[in-house]
Amino acid sequence: MSFVLRHLGNNLWSGRLDLFPGDALVHGFSARQGGVSAPPYDTLNMALHVEDDPAAVWENRRRYCAALGLSAERICTPRQVHGTEIVRVFRRDAGRGARDYADCIDDADA
């Protein structure tokens, strides 16, 4: 397994694992550059569970997803409990946690 880091433009970077064949799963790991959040969350904070401005978090998510060719409205986010649980998501899960932390998938990290 290898990790590839690529520049998406506008100071946005994304990492990708070659673990999945072709386009079987769109995924990425974001860096902290290229967003709009103010300190101490600067700049590309995408976490709704901290005290960052939710509008800034939404704009950061929108920018990152747009750079990947995705709709931020359809992303599905876990609560990220720093455990080992990975969940399978389905089309019906599209948008869970995209704008509202209370709607995230419970007790999972990915």
Q: Residue spans of the language-model regions?
A:
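Active-site microenvironment for binding and transforming phosphate-containing groups
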Residues: 1-110
